[in-house]
Amino acid sequence: MSRLNNKKQILIIIILSAVLILLIAALIILTNHGRTQDKADTATQSSAETAVTAVSTESETESATGVPKTTAAETEPATVVDSEAERDAYYSALVTEAQASGRKIVYLTFDDGSGTLTPTVLDTLDKYNVKATFFVVGNYSPSEDFARTEYNDIISRGHTLGIHSFTHSRANIYESFDAFKADADHMYNYVTELTGRPPRFWRFPGGSATSFADSRMKSDYIPYIESLGMTYYDWNVSSGDGSGNITRDKVYQNVINGVTNKDISVVLMHDGSGHDETVAALPSILDTLINEMNCLIVPITASTTPVQSQF
């Protein structure tokens, strides 16, 4: 009986020891989990603080330059509408403030790209922290890959991308409504596919007053462009670079003289093939407009009052 009692006591001790070991193990596990969670919380807090710092830094940069930064989020389809609305509001406020103080407003527009001269134009605009508007022609680019790169570069640098037809062949485009519709649809879909954004701005080849279109411009072509959700823009200052041979000095004089006589100028220039003199004149034009004439140079947005020919 004594031996049996001893065995029972030993068994109880073993069981109690096992339970104690399990309790100690559980305590260790819980302690380690708490430390891991603390580290995770610290990391999360650190990430949040980093994000706040990044946003603050970006805001300070925007304030210093006067130009809203284009963020990666703006390239996402879900935020396109919001970012465009914010951009419109930003430039609308700048224009309102400038007009109240008596400053001239200038919209620089470039037709017939994107070609091999477009990258140089973009770099020059960057040097002067100026945003412009590009009305591009589909088949004037060396290739579709080139067009994709340049169209998206125009957008990512904060400029406005508009369209100027796919072929720019006025004789063919304005031959009939069906021909016009086919070209406009082609370019609209082409730009949407390459950029992920449907275009909102259109410039008629030759302008809306072109003799190729006659009365059909008002009755057919303009209503169709508007049915696509686009606004068309003409110009009220011409650089004269579309007429063939012209020197950089003459391009400069045409632009500066035109802007001098207007409170609001929509300037027509070209960045397509053969317009090297325009590209060469651009730094002098920007220097005079900014440093001598104190003009506000902004891109066309939805809030911009269109300059359009009167019918």
Spans of features found by a protein language model:
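Gram-positive cell-envelope targeting signals
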Residues: M1-S59
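A short glycine-rich beta-strand->turn/loop micro-motif centered on a GG-aromatic cluster
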Residues: F134-G138, N294-P306
